[in-house]
Amino acid sequence: MEMEKTMQIIHSPEALHSVCAEWRRQGLKTALVPTMGYYHAGHASLISYARSVADKVIVSLFVNPTQFGPNEDLEAYPRDFEKDSALVRELGGDVLYAPEPENMYAPDHATWVEVPALANTLCGLSRPIHFRGVCTVVLKLFMLAQPSLAVFGEKDWQQLAIIKKMVSDLNVPVEVVGRPIVREADGLAFSSRNVYLTPEERAQAPQIRKSLEMAAGLAAGGERDAARIIEAVRGYLAEHLPTGEEDY
C-alpha cells in the first residue's frame, strides 16, 4: 500500500520540527495524536479520526518518564514498537515520532508546565507529579509539531480538561479535540494497562462502569443528595468489585 511506503519514523525533535514546518508552508492541515504506545482499539479510533480530518497525521509514541512517580510502572509499562508502528502505517499515519527520553529532556531540564487548579484533585491526589509531566511533554510536542489540531481520548477526562485549560491559558494555537471512549464488549474501556489485571480482576472491572451508570440513574430519577449517591455506589462496588480499592 502506498501509505505504508510513505510513513516516516522520526526520532529527533529537529527532524519532526522540520517535516511539520514544511507541511505548514504548503498550507496543509496537520493532526497530532499523542500516545504512549501499546495500541488498542481506542488508539486506533483516534488515529482514524485524525486521518479523516487532516491532510497529514503525526502520531507520537513516547513513554514519558516525567509523568510517572516513584514506585509507578515506568519500567513495566507495556511496549511493542513493531506492532504499534505497523498499526500506524495501516491506519495511514504520515509520521510516527518515537523519541528517546534524552531527545525530549536535557540532563539539566528544569522547566515545568502545571495547571494546579485542575490537577490537584481526583487522579492527581495520589499522583502529585503526573499532570505536571503530562502538560510539559504535551506542550513540547505542540511546539515541535505545531499541529492544526491534537486528538485525545475522553477516557482520561481529567487529562483532557487540563490540556484544554493549558492551551487556553497559554494561547497555544492548537485545537484540542476529545474523542469518545472505546469499550470492549462487556463495557470495560480499552486501556494499555488492562494487561495488568488478573482474570478475576478483569471479570469484575466492568462493574466500575455499571456503578457509574447506577449513579447517573439515581440522579436522573431525582436524587440530589450527593452523599447518598456516593454511598449507593460504594455499596454496589463493595458487593460486585471485592478485588477493587477506592482511589477517589
Segments from the language model and where they lie:
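Nucleotidyltransferase catalytic core that binds NTPs
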Residues: E2-Y248
